[in-house]
Amino acid sequence: MESTMRSPLPYGNACATCARAKCRCVPRNGGRGRCERCHHLNKECRAPQGRRKIQPKTLSRSVQLERKMDGLMSLLTSFGGRTDLPTPVQRQSEVQGMWRTEVESGTEDEETSASEEEYLRAFRTQRLQFLPLIHIPATTTVGDLKLQSPFLWQCISAVESKNTARQATLCVKIRELAGKRLLVDCDKSLDLLQGVLVYLAWITLHSQPHKSSLCMYSQMAIGLVFELGLNKPAPPDLSMTVSNSNAVGHMPGLEASISTRRTMHERRAVLSCFVLTSIIAQFLGRMGPLQWTSHMKQCLDILAESEESPGDRVLVQLTRTRLLVDQISHGPWSEGLYGLNSAQTLATFHLKALQSQLETIRAEIPIQLADNKPILFHLFDTELSLYEAALVKPLADEDFSSQRLDHLYACLRVVKQFFDLFFTIPPAGYTSLALPYIAQVSHCLVILFRLSTLDYPGWDKSTVKNTADILCIAEQISTRMAQVGDAIGMRSEGAYGDPFSKWGMMMQKLRSEWAIRLPDCSEVVVDRSSAESSCPSIEMGDLDCFVNWSELGWVMEGAGAGGFIQ
């Protein structure tokens, strides 16, 4: 009876044998020795290895919210009703700004506020004159730009830096930041799009280190245009921006990044994206440009009447010329232009229609922009694209064509006009040249080399040399590029030298290649070993297509392909 009055041990204190059998553990003999069950079964009564931990009781959600509210009320009471504190929206924007400008942490101390203001002034007054892809009012300060467009400011800093080592560091950080925001955080903003456009226009070709990134960053810009909806009319409200799957509730948390009111900044961005991707597509030959839409035509018409920025009308003319070039390049006569295959010539009615469009563009240029160099460069390049169809490899049974001969001389005339204008730019001005003009220089050099080596009845190659000697032009470009660094005060530090000096060395290498292949150049002495030693292992990224002339089959054939387009 005594054993039946004993109570079992409390939960968690049973011996290991009873705990394993999930039985009550009743002690015997005052708690000493074996328990009742182990005694009857003649088993070893082992003490438990460790007591089971009891999880603390969690507070209910209502209690947690009450404690948070009590903490907020006590915090507000301690500030005594101050009104000078930032609002939650202001605080959020400040935190975003701190996160977005984290790339500045390593380089902010190196630049003074005066030099930063000079960067902004130079970018606004010099670079945007050649490619007005954005409008920065004169009243905008560096602080304003850092707060409103932090990624754009980082790109401007990299472009305008006169220290090659710091420029290289900024370029790498910009790529890292762009990858994080675009691919990791899936961020979509006008600031990102404008920064990517600046990257494409200047950083890829003028800054260090050179990387083959034109194609990938072009697709980034096109993707941002799609995500922001800039190629389509702005919806009247955000409820119309969701996809069908989101409309039925499959993705209820998805927020649209599309604005309901189209701004002038957005119109400039989408047109600039079209201009840049159109030129890059022609330059590389392995991608397509941003597709033209009716809404982009509306943006073009609005900018044509804009009085907000003088650059708007320049951008309008650049866009119109690229539209015509795209129309020319999509014609059947262009199929053999950059290859060794034969192709049909440009029909007369096609030529007259395209010539009429080009003359319309010329006639609609405002009087004050008649001598604008960026517009003239694009007009020359458009005219060259129109007449270069005469350089396609003739069909085997094709008779002599006086029209083809006229087009060849028209190409020669346009190339001469282009370089005559190009050499009016002072050495310091070449640093402001954007990607479109570098591509146009390469285009003219390709055409001039083909004109200098073309065999066609009635075509006089000595006239080409007397009109525009490609060796003299290459020498002049090389000399001027070598003067740019000193003209702008560029400091070459670290492993990266002056990018413009590399341009000059690259032109010297090209000149040596041309001198070997050009006829009647026996008087030109070419030392290939010295040319290669002066240009050791130049890594030019997408500019490798400038250098790899010896690998192009059309050079050996004397006609056919289009040199820089690879």
Swiss-Prot record:
GO function term, MF aspect, one: zinc ion binding
Compartmental location: Nucleus
Primary location class? nucleus
**Effect of gene knockout:** Does not affect the production of oxopyrrolidines A and B.
Entry GO terms, CC:
nucleus
Q: Point out the DNA-binding stretch(es).
A: 15-45
Task: Work out whether the entry's keyword set contains DNA-binding.
Answer: yes
Alphabetized, the UniProt keywords read: DNA-binding, Nucleus, Transcription, Transcription regulation
**InterPro entries listed in its UniProt record:** prtT, Zn2-C6_fun-type_DNA-bd_sf, Zn2Cys6_DnaBD
Question: What does this protein's UniProt record list under function?
Answer: Transcription factor; part of the gene cluster that mediates the biosynthesis of oxopyrrolidines, polyketide-amino acid hybrid compounds with feature structures of tetramic acid.
Q: What is this protein called?
A: Transcription factor opdL
Q: Which organism is it from?
A: Penicillium oxalicum (strain 114-2 / CGMCC 5302)
Q: What is the lineage of its organism?
A: Eukaryota, Fungi, Dikarya, Ascomycota, Pezizomycotina
Q: Which gene is the coding source of this polypeptide chain?
A: opdl
